[in-house]
């Protein structure tokens, strides 16, 4: 395929998507494997589906056959990809779990966990995929993805992610030869393509911040969940989490990120005891129950979803107007993915409130800080991008605004009374 001559259908794409797609085709003329970085909520799935549509149409025009595989690691992502392919009228099959397979279809949507099982391995190898697209590609250094890439050395590959960053600072260059970066989050906010936000956090010298800083680190490189549970899943700290919600986000619909199932259940119970329609959800929540809870949330019948590692990727609900961070992490990728759930735009939403009860700002800066993604892509150590000064009140929190003044102080700091803030 001569990518320089490919006919692109850019109807319904925004300028940044059109530019990114052109850069992908140009990069494929020089490299076999490229990665695209684009912030959460700016249309990655729609973009690569448009690219798939271009490929399918151009191959048909030239009377050639084509096989495309789109890979993800979660059911929610696979369903989202399938729905977008259907919007484009692209016939596709599934390679996932017990789903019925239609391997004769030229586009396949596959779970990385299912593709290389003994049941599917032979059929996958027979497909001879010409293109492989990986969603949430910051996971693709895992052995399963490496094995998949090695099965199809001649295929063109595209990995898409908001965060080309690994907790161990591993380089992506072993899989991807080139990184295409999109504008920064601040650019999308200024263009009205992502939501403006206020950010509330604890002071760097607060007791909670000291507890976070002194928490045990697990072999994964992130904080130990057991230690976090022992330290932060206490009534007085949970009470401060609720008080901050009541002060800054009461009546809003949003998502809370908790440490583990017990922490999530305790927080949901606390919020419910104050009359807030809150439920806990985690990976062990039955699929049917999870679907019903998410539907109720999207329809507005549930105000607060307290989750454990569920709504970090592939969850699309633009009406979310507050995000509450109650789970410490050392992962920049997790931080950006979590706050990104609240930055989608929808009519009537002026700003998102981000309540940071565990001081992630003090590790990573604001969500829209300028990130040197090429630096992280190559595997260099972290740089905290705090390119704006901070203003604190005399108590324990600050509120950051995305506007010309950039920050404002908050004089009322009742939620920081006592030793924990």
Feature roles, as predicted:
Residues 283-290, 294-371:
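Conserved RecA-like P-loop NTPase helicase motor core
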Residues 179-257:
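Conserved interdomain linker/interface between the two RecA-like ATPase lobes of SF2 helicase motors
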